[in-house]
């Protein structure tokens, strides 16, 4: 039986409509694949987003299981003639129109989430937001996710979607600050209707280049914060909370049963 990991833990299919991502996250698998592994894009060009309108306008049929959007970019505000938010909303509407269930995953901008909640209100029962929040410390976030929103803005987005009546969840994969993860869980949990996922930063030594003292500091922090012993400590603290979920990277360490079917979101 093939291993169920990554996005397949959450969804059976995915959709994207933008190339590149202005957030330029240091650990990003899509950035690594495009710029390092396959060398399709220069590293300096990755933050220069380009809309794929063919994908945005694609007509979807109904499928069994959840569709995740996006997986290789994020949902970012329009910038002049670069209509990334408009493209994302058009793509989402086309997925939702046939009755599909959609998981929207983002390091969210309040401008984007406010508009998405308004535009997709009629599809509310088919949408689950999953906001990526790996730490509360903005210094840590700024190092790993240099152009993504602050913790405060992401927290505002979570509260906005929750108060607008949408289903909400959080992904703390990668967990960027293991020392603060319990406090963050407790702070976010009241605004989460679904679950808070916690997972390791995968392939950190492979994907992250250590070129400065700051790079070394933060890589060492990640490695120290996701040892087997630390993972077990976090598990023991949170295991009885009904809203906690463990990604495959944690389950492997903990000896928990792995997903056997794509898109079970468990």
For every predicted segment, state its role.
Residues 1-66, 253:
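N-terminal [4Fe-4S]-dependent radical SAM core
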Residues 17, 21, 87, 247:
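Functionally engaged cysteine thiol sites
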Residues 27, 208-211, 257-259:
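Short aromatic-enriched loop/helix-cap "lid" or pocket-rim segments at secondary-structure transitions
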Residues 33, 37-40, 81, 116, ...:
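Short linear functional motifs in flexible/disordered or boundary regions
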Residues 52-237:
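Conserved AdoMet/S-adenosylmethionine-binding subsite of the radical SAM
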Residues 229-266:
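C-terminal accessory regions of radical SAM enzymes
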